[in-house]
Amino acid sequence: MFFGTYTPKLDDKGRLTLPAKFRDALAGGLMVTKSQDHSLAVHPRAEFEEMIAEISAKAKRGNPQARAYLRNLAASTDEQYPDAQGRITLSAEHRRYANLTKECVVTGSIGFLEIWDAQAWQDYQELHEENFSAASDEALGDIL
């Protein structure tokens, strides 16, 4: 499971050092894909494969939106293996999509990581901070 917020820097070659505490969970490979809110999602490879199998089994191939989603997901996914220093190389397209600059934020999102441009993360936090309690009540209802 992935929790916490970290602030690694993106180097000139597009490499990002993953937080040390997550490296063991990602050592078997990881999948980087576009996510919501112009961020990137980083999934452990095995868990991503399970997710894709479930999505593929349930997707209604006759539905144009389902086909578009699957097509986009497959096209925007990049398999990576962290190097000895725990770095991954983010593609130019992923860096463009997430507007990544040198200053980045990596957040734990329970089952996966998110990579954000630092300013975009700050803006997102400011926009949603006041609504956190209301959103948790609405999204989680009686669970909490």
Swiss-Prot record:
Question: What Gene Ontology terms describe what this protein does at the molecular function level?
Answer: DNA-binding transcription factor activity; transcription cis-regulatory region binding
- Short name of one Pfam family: MraZ
Report one GO cellular component: cytoplasm
Task: Print the keywords alphabetically.
Answer: Cytoplasm, DNA-binding, Repeat, Transcription, Transcription regulation
**Superkingdom of the organism of origin:** Bacteria
Task: Enumerate the Gene Ontology biological process terms.
Answer: negative regulation of DNA-templated transcription initiation
**Locations listed in the record:** Cytoplasm, Nucleoid
According to the entry, every stretch annotated as the SpoVT-AbrB domain falls at: 5-47, 77-120
Which family does this protein fall into?
Answer: Belongs to the MraZ family.
Q: Which HAMAP family match?
A: MraZ
Its quaternary organisation is: Forms oligomers.
What protein name applies here? Answer: Transcriptional regulator MraZ
Q: Which gene encodes it?
A: mraZ
